[in-house]
Amino acid sequence: MKVISFEGFEYSGKSTQIKLLKKYFIKNNIKSTFTREPGGNKDLEKIRNVILKSNFDNLSLIMFFFASRFALLSSIKKSDFIVFDRFFDSTYAYQKYNSKEKKLIISLIKLIDKKFIPKITFYLKLDKKNLIRRKNKRLYSNKFDKKYFGQFSRIQKNYEEISKIKLGERKFVSIDASLSANEVHDKIILNLKKCKLIK
């Protein structure tokens, strides 16, 4: 079982790339499970709704995210690939955590069964100019979109910070999300082949 995760700010094209990868796996008869965080199944979608509508403090949010995460991982059936739409990097990147809280997150990540640590994480990186352009085209945004849009630089810095932390053998790949959807998809497939995750 190989785990892949997708990360990036809203409007980076993350959902589009996940759909393209899903089509690629189906076309090539690769058995895969696609899920998202927070959420992932009927019960955990309820936790997702609580998180999105809440005003919890940082520690409570960390506990909610990891309770949901551990429950999701224990429910996943064996598959060739598990693909996450957001994983622990988002937990680290989005909130205004102090150094003590960040250490707690890393400690909790290290409690995750090694088989669930991603072999590769794709971070779709978008500059603020392109992000604003895409945001203005979108009709819908949730509470987190609105809340964190003004914190772009801090979130990007946190993504770069966690990318340098060694977590198992995972490879953290940053891709220019301003490229066309097909160009980004090609880079994703190329990196999966480079890492010998697919042929």
Task: Please give the residue ranges for each predicted region.
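Post-Walker A helix-loop "phosphate-sensing" segment adjacent to the P-loop in P-loop NTPases
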Residues: K23-S32
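Walker A (P-loop) phosphate-binding loop of P-loop NTPases
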Residues: Y11
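A glycine- and Lys/Arg-enriched "phosphate-lid" helix/loop adjacent to the NTP-binding pocket
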Residues: T91-K157
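ATP-dependent small-molecule kinase phosphotransfer cores
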Residues: T33-I112
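Hydrophobic anchor at the beta1->P-loop junction of P-loop NTPases
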Residues: F6
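NTP-dependent small-molecule kinase module
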Residues: K22, K129-K199
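Hydrophobic positions on the alpha1 helix immediately C-terminal to the Walker A/P-loop
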Residues: Q17
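Conserved lysine of the Walker
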Residues: K14
